[in-house]
Amino acid sequence: MRILKSHPLLKIVNSYIIDSPQPANLSYLWNFGSLLALCLGIQIVTGVTLAMHYTPSVSEAFNSVEHIMRDVNNGWLVRYLHSNTASAFFFLVYLHIGRGLYYGSYKTPRTLTWAIGTVILIVMMATAFLGYVLPYGQMSLWGATVITNLMSAIPWIGQDIVEFIWGGLYTDEPQCGDVLLKILLNAGKSPILGFAYDLFFIIVLLIGVKIAMTRGKSAGVRSLHTSEASQRLHAGDLTYAYLVGLFEGDGYFSITKKGKYLTYELGIELSIKDVQLIYKIKKILGIGIVSFRKINEIEMVALRIRDKNHLKSFILPIFEKYPMFSNKQYDYLRFRNALLSGIISLEDLPDYTRSDEPLNSIESIINTSYFSAWLVGFIEAEGCFSVYKLNKDDDYLIASFDIAQRDGDILISAIRKYLSFTTKVYLDKTNCSKLKVTSVRSVENIIKFLQNAPVKLLGNKKLQYLLWLKQLRKISRYSEKIKIPSNY
């Protein structure tokens, strides 16, 4: 590895092939750039070979093409390979552009790279046009006539420009008498062929510049210090505190052995109803892979982040700025220490059992500046809004809000105190600390909190909450004593 990073030539190969940062969500869409490079190589080799035998003359063009097809070894293959690769070239170019549009490659910090790509496309179109109108038959003649006639649309001077390009009143010996091209290009026997070559080498140069500028800036790979996400985090955007609360409820930190080395993963798995929430989280973070699976016939959607660079650069700063309150923080501390220590072997990983010792007191939790935003995220994960009948044969409806967490007595008690609930925390059948409220005052308190919180519910829980408010308006016990908001 030392010679790869010290040798003047090998270190270039190493930087672009081995150490080059790439998106964690790589897909087949990232193949088009390399396929275009393959097409470019084929076009150069076949184009130079054909040019050796082609005569750019109205009288000799057909004979030279027949010579290529009949007399040159595998000339027919070279010609057809050149023409079909040209079509494939543009097909792949448009797919490559589509990939860039979909993943926002035109945005900062890749704006200049995108602009160079646009120039490459324009030069490619010009090169393809010049290759198309090389003298061979009627299509070349009228192709050149029609395209160059576009200049005639320029008011007053258009027709003069067309005749200047043609070198006369009509296209003949395709612009071989064009003084302008001869002066600019000094291209030898055929200005068109020479101009095509010049443009082709311009394309190669621009592609080299574009590749150099793209290094480290591929769509989906963003520097923490330059990304919008980083700026929002350092500016104190409480959306990230919301995410910490969400991950504390339903997320996990895992270190598992898959193959020879350890895999570090931050993940969250929710019901398919929350698929939009998963994609919103991915959009906020800008990283991660979304996957789907069935568990006992229940559709689930998950977001997983496994790239170590992303974990170090994006995830750890969030959880350092907004620490979790429950004992799941022990899982994070173990995860962080192992990740930063560079442990890759299971044998080097210390044994771990989550401690039962509380990390925080009730007072320290509720006095934390970001607790309200964190609580919205935690409600998104573990909260439940419901309306039910007190008795099956009775029409008397009860509205309830409940929230629970395993081994979370201190945390749930802090939520109880923060929201001024009077109901006691209890252990349910699954050994989770649970809080359930149904009183008018408690329902009013949770509504006021959510309406005035610094962040809003984002997922399916938001729909559940809105439906809950709609049902509350129909229950006189609550609607007569609570000012139920009309929107959220």
Curated annotation (Swiss-Prot):
Residues 1-169 are annotated as: cobA exon 1 encoded. The keyword Translocase does not apply. InterPro entries: Cyt_b/b6_N, Cytb/b6-like_sf, Cytochrome_b_N_euk/bac, Di-haem_cyt_TM, Homing_endonucl, LAGLIDADG_dom. This is Intron-encoded DNA endonuclease I-AniI. In the C-terminal section; belongs to the LAGLIDADG endonuclease family. The keyword Ribonucleoprotein does not apply. One of its GO terms (molecular function) is endonuclease activity. GO terms for biological process: intron homing; mRNA processing; RNA splicing. It is an enzyme of class 3 (hydrolase). Its EC number is 3.1.-.-. It comes from Emericella nidulans. The mature protein may arise from proteolytic cleavage of an in-frame translation of cobA exon 1 plus intron, containing the I-AniI open reading frame. Cleavage may take place close to Met-213 resulting in an active endonuclease/maturase of about 30 kDa.
